[in-house]
Amino acid sequence: MSCVPWKGDKVKSESLELPQAAPPQIYHEKQRRELCALHALNNVFQDSNAFTRETLQEIFQRLSPNTMVTPHKKSMLGNGNYDVNVIMAALQTKGYEAVWWDKRRDVGAIALTNVMGFIMNLPSSLCWGPLKLPLKRQHWICVREVGGAYYNLDSKLKMPEWIGGKSELRKFLKHHLRGKNCELLLVVPEEVEAHQSWRADV
C-alpha cells in the first residue's frame, strides 16, 4: 500500500468551520531544489534562519567525512537530499531530539502536548516542470501545531494545509502510517526524550 493524499473525514470536514479569529502567522518554507529536509526543519522551528543548506552540509560532512573525497563529488552528494542521521544531528544542535515512532503502535499513545512537531518521511510524486511523473521518491515533510491547530507544512504545498485539532491530527498520522515506506519522527526537547514524557502510556 502506498501513501495517498490526505482527504480527511469528508463528512466532518465539510461541516467544520475555521475559527473566526484572525488566522495565525505561519512560516511555510516551500520546495527549492532537493532541500526538503532543510525546509522540514525550518518549518518545525517556524524560523527561516534555524538552519541553512551550509549548516546541514557541514553536519553531513562531519557524519560522513569519507564521502567528500574530491571537489567534483561535493556537488553531487551535497544536493540537499539528506537522510535521517543529518536531521537528528541538526536537531541536537538546538537541544532537541528526534524520536522514531514505531508505526505498529497506536498514535493515541503520543503525548501531543510534549511534542513540538513531527517530521515525516513518505513517498512523493516527482515532477518535471508542470508534468507529474509516474515515479515516487522519499520526501521529508513537517507537521506541527500553530495557534491551537495542526497544519501540514509540506514544502511542496502552495500553502499550509489545515488539519485540525488533536483528534484530526491522529487520523492524519494514522492515514499516512498505514502506507508503505512512511515513517514518523517526533521532535521533542532533550528533557522530554530523556524522561520519555512524549509517551502518554507511561
From Swiss-Prot:
PANTHER family: JOSEPHIN 1, 2 (PTHR13291), JOSEPHIN-1 (PTHR13291:SF1). One of its GO terms (biological process) is endocytosis. Its main location: membrane. One of its GO terms (cellular component) is cytoplasm. Keywords: Cell membrane, Cytoplasm, Hydrolase, Membrane, Phosphoprotein, Protease, Ubl conjugation, Ubl conjugation pathway. Interacts with beta-actin/ACTB. Monoubiquitinated. Ubiquitination activates deubiquitination activity in vitro. Deubiquitinates monoubiquitinated probes (in vitro). When ubiquitinated, cleaves 'Lys-63'-linked and 'Lys-48'-linked poly-ubiquitin chains (in vitro), hence may act as a deubiquitinating enzyme. May increase macropinocytosis and suppress clathrin- and caveolae-mediated endocytosis. May enhance membrane dynamics and cell motility independently of its catalytic activity. InterPro entries: JOSD1/2, Josephin. The modification Phosphoserine is found at residue 15. This is Josephin-1. It catalyses: Thiol-dependent hydrolysis of ester, thioester, amide, peptide and isopeptide bonds formed by the C-terminal Gly of ubiquitin (a 76-residue protein attached to proteins as an intracellular targeting signal). Its EC number is 3.4.19.12. Residues 23-202 form the Josephin domain.
